[in-house]
Amino acid sequence: MSEMEKITIENIVASTSLAEHLDLSKIALALEGSEYEPEQFPGLIYRLQEPKTAVLIFRSGKVNCTGAKNLDDVKKTIDIIIDKLKKADIEVYDNPDIIVQNIVAVYDLESNLNLTDIAMSLGLENVEYEPEQFPGLVYRVEEPKVVLLLFGSGKVVCTGAKEENEIEQAVIKVKKDLQKVGLI
């Protein structure tokens, strides 16, 4: 089993642009169940059940998609929004570029970790560990540029990845680093 098969993607945040300008009041009427309260938040929130995602739509035409577990769901979500807006006679781009901003994933090293020893071994320039503040160790990986949160249980949360393969690279790197110093 490859490392990627053991990694669970929890959330993908992606962005796109659907137009130069959008009338959010008109969209709020067109998208049943949407939330638009401009005095509290400048964007319109719309939640989909399938795929289970949410989009934030802004007057500037920018759209953020969150909650997707894979890239297909991101694309499907954006396509659904485009379709619904076009049906409401709201002009939007046909096939906008979608940019992944962040992928959050979880991995289990299947071994308890001594975070104090790890903090000493991995070098203070890339590690933050203050157990009184937060129970995990923050490990900033240079290449790929991601942040790993390591917990005593052996669970690892990866954040900051833009591509799925970066998560796998980071997991392989941290495993090698920990094996090299005999901590797993």
Curated annotation (Swiss-Prot):
SUPFAM superfamilies for this protein: TATA-box binding protein-like
- Establish whether keyword Chloroplast is in the entry: no
Q: Which UniProt keywords apply?
A: DNA-binding, Repeat, Transcription, Transcription regulation
Task: Return the Gene3D superfamilies for the record.
Answer: TATA-Binding Protein
Q: Which Pfam families match?
A: TBP (PF00352)
- One GO process term, biological-process aspect: DNA-templated transcription initiation
Give the family, as the similarity comment puts it.
Answer: Belongs to the TBP family.
Function summary: General factor that plays a role in the activation of archaeal genes transcribed by RNA polymerase. Binds specifically to the TATA box promoter element which lies close to the position of transcription initiation.
| Entries under InterPro entries matching the protein | TBP, TBP_archaea, TBP_CS, TBP_dom_sf
- Alphabetized NCBIfam families for the sequence: PRK00394.1-2, PRK00394.2-2, PRK00394.2-3
The sequence repeats are found at: 9-85, 100-178
UniProt organism field: Picrophilus torridus (strain ATCC 700027 / DSM 9790 / JCM 10055 / NBRC 100828 / KAW 2/3)
Name of this chain's protein: TATA-box-binding protein
Give this protein's Gene Ontology molecular function annotations.
DNA binding; DNA-binding transcription factor activity
